Amino acid sequence: MALERTFSIIKPDAVAKNVIGAIYNRFESAGLRIVASKMLHLSKEQAEGFYAEHSERPFFGALVEFMTSGPVMVQVLEGENAVLKNREIMGATNPAEALAGTLRADYAASIDENACHGSDAPESAAREIAYFFSDEEICPRTR
Ligand code: RTP
Ligand code: MG
């Protein structure tokens, strides 16, 4: 299978828990490569734009407030089947339903503060990567 890219966020709760490295280790151990990465403190406008598809949902205000409550790490992950693989590493949206050993089972406190984001399809991955990274900021493997 060809290499695929996905977009990932380590959300403010997980950054506050000081588990950026632990989460990066999960990605790398699963064969995903970090090809772009940066720390950001999202503005309200950035968070609203990123989650625009949820703008009519009842949890939208709380989601934007949470996502702007502290710094996040945003990254591009590359590997075989990266979109699905990252979703498996993360576990279910609600940590109460997440399988043991997934990021959300281990690091998330609730469905509202659930440690990480991962694109849900290759199309959303492309859109989300472009939302946060220019082409020059992505450094694919050369050796
Ligand atoms: P994400 O986009 O953050 O990776 O999460 P996801 O695909 O697993 O879930 P999604 O349906 O896209 O929802 C985005 C985020 O909104 C919050 N949410 N809260 N209270 C609720 O019922 C509810 N549902 C979703 C979660 O923080 C979720 O990650
Ligand atoms: Mg989603």
Swiss-Prot record:
Its EC number is 2.7.4.6. It comes from the Bacteria. Keywords: ATP-binding, Cytoplasm, Kinase, Magnesium, Metal-binding, Nucleotide metabolism, Nucleotide-binding, Phosphoprotein, Transferase. It is an enzyme of class 2 (transferase). The active site is at H117. One of its GO terms (molecular function) is ATP binding. ATP binds at K11, F59, R87, T93, R104, N114. Major role in the synthesis of nucleoside triphosphates other than ATP. The ATP gamma phosphate is transferred to the NDP beta phosphate via a ping-pong mechanism, using a phosphorylated active-site intermediate. HAMAP family: NDP_kinase. Homotetramer. This is Nucleoside diphosphate kinase. The lineage of its organism: Bacteria, Pseudomonadati, Pseudomonadota, Gammaproteobacteria, Alteromonadales.
